[in-house]
A protein has these predicted regions:
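Short Gly/Pro-enriched turn/cap motifs at secondary-structure boundaries
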Residues: 2-6, 32-35, 55-56, 82-89
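Active-site beta-strand/loop segments that form the cofactor-binding cradle
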Residues: 1-4, 29-31, 35-37, 147, ...
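Short beta-strand or tight-loop elements
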Residues: 9-11, 40, 72, 162
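Cysteine-centered functional microenvironments
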Residues: 1-2, 10-12, 27-30, 195
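Short structured motifs
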Residues: 11, 77-80
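Flavin-dependent oxidoreductase catalytic core characteristic
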Residues: 10, 16-23, 59-64, 87-94, ...
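A short core secondary-structure module
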Residues: 23-76
Length: 309
């Protein structure tokens, strides 16, 4: 059983610095590693002892390393048997007294979590773009079938229920592509903080693609259920997208907690001001006015679209 998944801080793999400080010695293992059976270079996250410069206390913190199989001590298990993405080589990787040069630390010692988040953000962003292609392929298959298939003397495309399914598929595709372009635009402009957008894009894309593939099979009926059509494979392959790169459940918690944290920071000065409200009317009044406007359905800032009901 895995010791860590969504809980990245529970990593057990360790890397201890050598006595002369020239390298780290890595021991432990990782499971479910993509390309683990033949990869020559790995990005490995491991617990390392880090001394706090202020207190002098030593604590374990995650550090990212670039590990090469040629270092020695790197082995792997047999490929895993999976529900989907079977063409992807997924295997356990084991590390036994692997000597990693100190120059192979990614970022800084103890800064592995930041590196992991950067990698995950990129992966989540790319998911929206990749799954847009999957959805488009499914929509084409469902549409072609609806145009050609005749039942009860009518083409499937002429039934309102089928039209609704096709419309729903295209709506989700459009939204997924729009989110992918938005996140890509933020990245191109050099934005450093796009983790919320990447998380939301990953959730929406993975769940929309699953829905579109499922509805495609439904439109095709028995034909879609057969392996020859290929959509059962698409559905199996899509299931992992709601799990890896951060499960959708964890990402929902992340989005909610980040939003609450942001609101908490906004309310912090108000909390302090309320201890002496008459002396801090300048701080309290704008917030109170904004809350009153919200209750009345008025925008917080000027808008041409608002009109009293």
């Amino acid at each position: 059983m895995p010791s860590s998944g969504s809980d990245a801080a529970s990593i057990r793999t360790r890397a201890e610095p050598s006595a002369d400080g020239s390298h780290f010695v890595l021991n432990g293992g990782k499971i479910w590693i993509s390309n683990g059976g033949f990869a020559e270079i790995f990005t490995v996250f491991a617990q390392t002892p880090v001394k706090d410069p202020k207190t002098g206390e030593t604590k374990d913190k995650v550090t990212a390393f670039i590990v090469e199989r040629s270092f020695g001590g790197v082995t792997n298990g047999a490929p895993e048997k999976k529900m989907g993405i079977k063409c992807s080589n997924t295997a356990e990787v084991h590390f036994e007294d692997v000597k990693i040069p100190k120059e192979n630390v990614l970022g800084e010692v103890g800064g592995g979590f930041k590196v992991a988040m950067a990698i995950l953000n990129n992966g989540r962003f790319g998911m929206g773009a990749a799954l847009s292609g999957t959805m488009r392929s499914c929509i084409k298959g469902a549409t072609d079938h609806a145009v050609q298939r005749v039942q009860f003397g009518k083409h499937l495309k002429d039934f309102g229920l089928i039209k609704g399914k096709i419309a729903g598929m295209n709506t989700r595709l459009y939204a997924t592509e729009a989110m992918a372009y938005m996140v890509a635009g933020n990245m191109d402009r050099g934005a450093e903080d796009y983790q919320l957008e990447a998380a939301a894009s990953k959730i929406f894309a993975s769940e929309s693609a699953w829905w579109v593939a499922d509805e495609t099979i439904q439109v095709l009926g028995g034909t879609g259920f057969m392996t020859d059509a290929g959509y059962e494979r698409v559905l199996r392959d899509l299931r992992i997208f709601r799990i890896f790169e951060g499960t959708n459940d964890i990402l929902r918690l992340f989005i909610a907690l980040t939003g609450l944290q942001s609101l908490g920071k906004q309310l912090e000065p108000i909390s302090k001001a309320m201890k002496n409200p008459f002396a801090n009317l300048g701080t309290i009044a704008p917030v109170a006015l904004g809350m009153a406007k919200a209750r009345m359905g008025m925008p917080d800032r000027p808008s041409l679209s608002w009109a009293p009901s």
